[in-house]
């Protein structure tokens, strides 16, 4: 195991519930003297879920935010394992492996980055936006979902950069997909970053390529081990097959065989 990966017992110390299927969990080490390892934008954790029939493997969750004392994870109920996490009361304890994966390349000062997120893919976009703002770069967020009830707290994003929204049912923001939003025609961007459902990212990457804008994507392939051993998350690239958990999850979209 890499020396910079830690195995930490953490307690769920707070919850921000957005729907019956989505919440932001605040975790802290059970050992008060333990410091949360530095987690870079795009990196993720693997949570061990105990006492759940049929769930043997850890669950990968993107890092939303992290400090020396707390770790925030945006968790969506997508199956047995994450259902346990979504229903866990404050005070529940979990073994968490972190930090895993690579990170985004942040542009130089003066850049105009667009951060595109869909579903729980908004989590690494928030972490990235905060990192950019800390370096004096103003990010623009473009977030999409089926309806308004599928979003987390949008005020978090609005406090970091300019925010634009799309929903398929027109319940919030512009109706349609992120690639149909008027902001793509109204403003010029120098860099594109994305995380969300693969069809969404493919469409965004295609648009970015047509516009001649470099783009990076954080992939959401199914993962098991989180350290590149089991090979269940392999993604074909122009440089051969890569493990998303270890070589990624962040890739330059020119590396991906999406066409």
Each PLM stretch: what is its role?
Residues 2-90:
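Ferredoxin-reductase
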Residues 14, 65, 165-167, 217, ...:
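Structural signal for conserved beta-strand scaffold positions within catalytic alpha/beta enzyme cores
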Residues 80-220, 224:
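FNR/FR-type flavoprotein reductase catalytic core
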């Amino acid at each position: 195991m890499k020396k910079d990966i830690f195995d930490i017992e953490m307690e769920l110390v707070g919850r921000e519930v957005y729907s019956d299927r989505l919440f932001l969990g605040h975790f802290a080490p059970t050992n008060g003297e333990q410091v949360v390892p530095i987690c870079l934008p795009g990196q993720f954790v693997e949570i061990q879920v105990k006492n759940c029939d049929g769930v043997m493997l850890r669950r990968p969750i993107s890092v939303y935010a992290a400090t020396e004392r707390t770790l925030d994870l945006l968790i969506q109920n997508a199956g047995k394992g994450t259902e346990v996490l979504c229903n866990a009361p404050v005070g529940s304890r979990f073994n968490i492996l972190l930090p895993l994966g690579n990170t985004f390349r942040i542009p130089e000062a003066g850049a105009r980055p667009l951060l595109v997120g869909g579903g729980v893919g908004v989590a690494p976009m928030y972490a990235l936006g905060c990192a950019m703002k800390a370096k004096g770069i103003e990010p623009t967020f473009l977030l999409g979902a089926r309806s308004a009830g599928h979003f987390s707290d949008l005020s978090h994003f609005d406090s970091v950069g300019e925010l634009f929204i799309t929903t398929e049912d027109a319940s919030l923001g512009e109706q349609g997909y992120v690639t149909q939003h008027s902001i793509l025609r109204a403003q010029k961007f120098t860099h594109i970053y994305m995380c969300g459902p693969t069809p969404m990212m493919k469409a965004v990457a295609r648009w970015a390529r047509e516009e001649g804008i470099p783009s990076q994507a954080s992939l959401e392939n199914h993962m098991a081990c989180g350290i590149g051993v089991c090979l269940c998350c392999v993604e074909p690239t122009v440089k051969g097959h890569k493990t998303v958990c270890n070589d990624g999850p962040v890739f330059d979209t020119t590396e991906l065989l999406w066409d």
